[in-house]
Amino acid sequence: MGIEGVLEKGFITTSADKVLNWTRTGSLWPMTFGLACCAVEMMHAGASRYDLDRFGIVFRPSPRQSDLMIVAGTLCNKMAPALRKVYDQMAEPRWVLSMGSCANGGGYYHYSYSVVRGCDRIVPVDVYVPGCPPTAEALLYGIIQLQNKIKRTCTIAR
């Protein structure tokens, strides 16, 4: 948490920014936006072997209850407005994790007329997880990188 000082009487001094960011990293609630085979790996990461619950990550069915969107799979042009609409319904602060080659840049279908060449053209992306499909370990590493990014953000001074 970055505690600056611990006094002898049991007091801890720190900044409000660090406390807020610490609480946000321990309670990420992702909204699944599974579009293709990467969604299977995302479900695998939520199962008992990797157990995202131990990191405080609980998958939510509604965008109004979530603060992290995991875009997993090929995003087509018809699905792009729905992705933006779901993103706009999420509460602030919100983060986006792009999972897989198709979500990152179109992947195997990059030159298709109906595929968006990266979900970052529709919503701002915070973390990219490469792979086709990326493993559950790669998704877990991407979530840990997002938690590190959240810890470094300046919350109150915005």
UniProtKB/Swiss-Prot annotation:
Its cofactor is [4Fe-4S] cluster. Binds 1 [4Fe-4S] cluster. It comes from the Bacteria. Keywords: 4Fe-4S, Cell inner membrane, Cell membrane, Iron, Iron-sulfur, Membrane, Metal-binding, NAD, Quinone, Translocase, Transport, Ubiquinone. The keyword rRNA-binding does not apply. Its main location: membrane. It is found in: Cell inner membrane. Its EC number is 7.1.1.-. It holds the Pfam family Oxidored_q6. It catalyses: a quinone + NADH + 5 H(+)(in) = a quinol + NAD(+) + 4 H(+)(out). GO terms for molecular function: 4 iron, 4 sulfur cluster binding; iron ion binding; NADH dehydrogenase (ubiquinone) activity; NADH:ubiquinone reductase (non-electrogenic) activity; quinone binding. One of its GO terms (biological process) is aerobic respiration. One of its GO terms (cellular component) is plasma membrane. [4Fe-4S] cluster binds at C37, C38, C102, C132. It is an enzyme of class 7 (translocase). NDH-1 shuttles electrons from NADH, via FMN and iron-sulfur (Fe-S) centers, to quinones in the respiratory chain. The immediate electron acceptor for the enzyme in this species is believed to be ubiquinone. Couples the redox reaction to proton translocation (for every two electrons transferred, four hydrogen ions are translocated across the cytoplasmic membrane), and thus conserves the redox energy in a proton gradient. Belongs to the complex I 20 kDa subunit family. This is NADH-quinone oxidoreductase subunit B. It comes from Laribacter hongkongensis (strain HLHK9). The lineage of its organism: Bacteria, Pseudomonadati, Pseudomonadota, Betaproteobacteria, Neisseriales. The gene is nuoB.
